[in-house]
From Swiss-Prot:
Pathway: Lipid metabolism; malonyl-CoA biosynthesis; malonyl-CoA from acetyl-CoA: step 1/1. Residues 47-316 form the CoA carboxyltransferase N-terminal domain. It is found in: Plastid, Chloroplast stroma. The gene is accD. This is Acetyl-coenzyme A carboxylase carboxyl transferase subunit beta, chloroplastic. A zinc finger (C4-type) spans 51-73. Its EC number is 2.1.3.15. InterPro entries: AcCoA_carboxyl_beta, Acetyl_CoA_COase_Trfase_b_su, ClpP/crotonase-like_dom_sf, COA_CT_N. HAMAP family: AcetylCoA_CT_beta. NCBIfam families: accD. It comes from Marchantia polymorpha (Common liverwort). Component of the acetyl coenzyme A carboxylase (ACC) complex. Biotin carboxylase (BC) catalyzes the carboxylation of biotin on its carrier protein (BCCP) and then the CO(2) group is transferred by the transcarboxylase to acetyl-CoA to form malonyl-CoA. Acetyl-CoA carboxylase is a heterohexamer composed of biotin carboxyl carrier protein, biotin carboxylase and 2 subunits each of ACCase subunit alpha and ACCase plastid-coded subunit beta (accD). PROSITE patterns: COA_CT_NTER. GO terms for cellular component: acetyl-CoA carboxylase complex; chloroplast stroma.
Length: 316
C-alpha cells in the first residue's frame, strides 16, 4: 500500500466514525432511552484508546459504558473520580463537600516549574481543585460518606488539601454515624509540600481511630491501580474491610527501590492485588461492575452484627 493510499483510507475511516457519532447523538441509531445510558464523550480527546494490559484497541464510548473494563482481557483501566462517584452513588443523591478548598505554595517549591503553576495546570486539565472529591450520598438507598482520589490530578498525590478534606469527611461521618468509604488511587505523599504532606498520614489515622474504635463505625478502603506510598502506609490499609480491584498495583515502595535497597531480585507480580490477597493483606478482590452490589450487602450484614451496635443506625 502506498503512502497516499494509506492517508486516503485513514481519512475515509475517520469520516465514517464521525458520521456514526453524529447519527448516534441525533437518535438515528439509539433511541432517547438508549442514549441516556451512554456517557457523552469529548471527541477532542480521541475516539480510541489502547488497553494497558493486552494492548487491544478500545472504542472510548463503549469502554466508558463498560465501566472502563477491557472487553478483551477484563483489565480494569483507570477511572476519574467523577466516573467512580457515578458508579457508586445513586443518581441525584450526591452532595459534595469542601469543593473550593485549594492548596497554597507555602514552601515556594519549584523544580522544572513552580508548584503554583502545576496546581493551576491540573485544575484546568481535570476540572478539580485537588486530587480528591469528598461528599455524602446514597448507595442503593444507604447514606454513606465517600472520598474518591483522582490519579489524573498530580498522580493522586496526598497534600494538605487531600488530607484536610479526608479528615473533615471522616469527622462528619463520625458525627452523623455514617459508614465511610475511601477509594484510593495515589502515588503517595506530595513532595512539593514536604512535611506538611507527611503529617496528613498521622492526622487521618487519628480521626479514623475515633471513627472505628470509639464510635464502632464502618470504614471500607477500596484500593485501585495504583495505590502506593503514604496512602498505602496510612488510611489505605486501615479499613475494617479492605477491597481491591483485580490486578491493582498496591505497594509502599516501588520494585526498583526495593531491589536496590535489599540488593536482591524481587519476583514479578508480588505487588499486585492477587498476591497481597494470597498473603492475607486484603479481604476481597471485587470486579468493578460488581462493586456497588457487594458494598450494599456488606452494609446490610454489618448493620445486623451484634458487636457493632451504635446509637443512630444509617438505616431508617
Amino acid at each position: 500500500m502506498s503512502l497516499m493510499n494509506w492517508f486516503e483510507d485513514k481519512r475515509r475511516f475517520g469520516g465514517l466514525i464521525g458520521a456514526f457519532i453524529e447519527k448516534a447523538t441525533k437518535g438515528y441509531i439509539f433511541s432517547e432511552r438508549e442514549k441516556d445510558r451512554y456517557i457523552k464523550i469529548d471527541t477532542t480527546k480521541g475516539l480510541w484508546t489502547r488497553c494497558d494490559n493486552c494492548e487491544n484497541m478500545l472504542y472510548v464510548r463503549f469502554l466508558r459504558q463498560n465501566k472502563r473494563i477491557c472487553e478483551e482481557c477484563g483489565y480494569h483501566l483507570q477511572m476519574s473520580s467523577t466516573e467512580r462517584i457515578e458508579l457508586l452513588i445513586d443518581r441525584g443523591t450526591w452532595y459534595p463537600m469542601d469543593e473550593d478548598m485549594t492548596a497554597r505554595d507555602v514552601l515556594k517549591f519549584s523544580d522544572e516549574d513552580s508548584y503554583k503553576n502545576r496546581i493551576a495546570f491540573y485544575q484546568k486539565r481535570t476540572g478539580l481543585t485537588d486530587a480528591i472529591q469528598t461528599g455524602i450520598g446514597q448507595l442503593n438507598g444507604i447514606p454513606i460518606a465517600l472520598g474518591v482520589m483522582d490519579f489524573q490530578f498530580m498522580g493522586g498525590s496526598m497534600g494538605s488539601v487531600v488530607g484536610e478534606k479526608i479528615t473533615r469527611l471522616i469527622e462528619y461521618a463520625t458525627r452523623a454515624s455514617m459508614p465511610l468509604i475511601i477509594v484510593c488511587s495515589s502515588g503517595g505523599a506530595r513532595m512539593q509540600e514536604g512535611t506538611l504532606s507527611l503529617m496528613q498520614m498521622a492526622k487521618i489515622s487519628s480521626v479514623l481511630q475515633i471513627h472505628q474504635a470509639q464510635k464502632r463505625l464502618l470504614y471500607i478502603a477500596i484500593l485501585t491501580y495504583p495505590t502506593t506510598g503514604g496512602v498505602t502506609a496510612s488510611f489505605g490499609m486501615l479499613g475494617d474491610i479492605i477491597i481491591a480491584e483485580p490486578k491493582a498495583y498496591i505497594a509502599f515502595a516501588g520494585k526498583r527501590v526495593i531491589e536496590q535497597t535489599l540488593r536482591q531480585k524481587i519476583p514479578d507480580g508480588f505487588q499486585v492485588a492477587e498476591s497481597l490477597f494470597d498473603h492475607g493483606l486484603l479481604d476481597l478482590i471485587v470486579p468493578r461492575n460488581l462493586l456497588k452490589g457487594v458494598l450494599s450487602e456488606i452494609f446490610e450484614l454489618y448493620n445486623a452484627a451484634p458487636c457493632k451496635k451504635f446509637q443512630n443506625s444509617f438505616f431508617k
